[in-house]
């Protein structure tokens, strides 16, 4: 069962599309919307949405409501989200095995107005579904409960 934890977001339409998709996929876990924050070097970084699931691990969502701008900037944002989440999780030794983090971190941007897509930039909800279906957390059974602690 998926538990949805709603915060405040200005991107509710895109968030609802993701929520509807996740509910049809039968994932177990938590979907946090509108308030997950990561600490970065330059201050706090807001994450539009965060999925924590035994099947997928962690998925950080960037919900983009604007038309395509600079792809390099978007990729840099996704890298920054990944790096900050990795740094946060590595503080918890019980999530690693021999210095290797056992929780997969995935980032994607759902940007339906973009014309250009990439591995991490999905321009349709179908692409988001394909991306999520491609994820597998082999150590999920062992580390999922630890992740929620």
Set out the residue ranges of the language-model regions.
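Intrinsically disordered, low-complexity Ser/Thr/Pro/Gly-rich regulatory segments
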Residues: 1-47, 51-149
């Amino acid at each position: 069962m998926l538990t949805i934890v709603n915060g405040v977001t200005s991107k509710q339409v895109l968030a609802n599309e993701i929520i509807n998709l996740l509910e049809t996929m039968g994932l177990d876990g938590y979907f946090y919307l509108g308030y997950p924050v990561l600490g970065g070097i330059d201050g706090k970084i807001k994450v539009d949405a965060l999925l924590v699931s035994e099947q997928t691990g962690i998925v950080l969502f960037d919900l983009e409501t604007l038309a395509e701008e600079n792809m390099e900037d978007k990729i840099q944002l996704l890298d920054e989200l990944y790096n900050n989440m990795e740094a946060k999780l590595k503080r918890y030794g019980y999530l690693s095995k021999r210095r290797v983090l056992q929780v997969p971190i995935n980032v994607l941007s759902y940007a339906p107005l973009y014309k250009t897509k990439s591995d991490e930039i999905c321009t349709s909800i179908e692409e988001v579904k394909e991306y999520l279906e491609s994820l597998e957390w082999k150590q999920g059974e062992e580390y999922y409960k630890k992740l929620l602690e």
